[in-house]
Amino acid sequence: MNISKAEQRVLHVLAKGGYIAFTRDDAGRVTHVQCLTREGLGLADCSLAVFTKLKTKRLILSRQGRPYRVTIDGLKAVRAQLDNR
């Protein structure tokens, strides 16, 4: 599966325990997204376009109105990255 660099960065953060917080408008459409790490720091690469691509590919999922998290398919699709902690 072809995944862009921005999508890889977002999936990597989600795979490590992060989540995507979102806001909806009156019609129920997602209007704003923010990717947060498990420490609570924001990721600048997470845009509405990246969010839509990940959701269309079913790599992220929201259950019962909670923030979006990575799916099993998303974990399989993410490539390993070096963590400079």
From Swiss-Prot:
Q: Which family does it belong to?
A: Belongs to the UPF0386 family.
The record's listing under InterPro entries reads:
YjhX_toxin
- Transmembrane domains' residue ranges: none
Q: Which organism is it from?
A: Serratia proteamaculans (strain 568)
Xref: HAMAP family: UPF0386
Name of the protein described by the UniProt record: UPF0386 protein Spro_1532
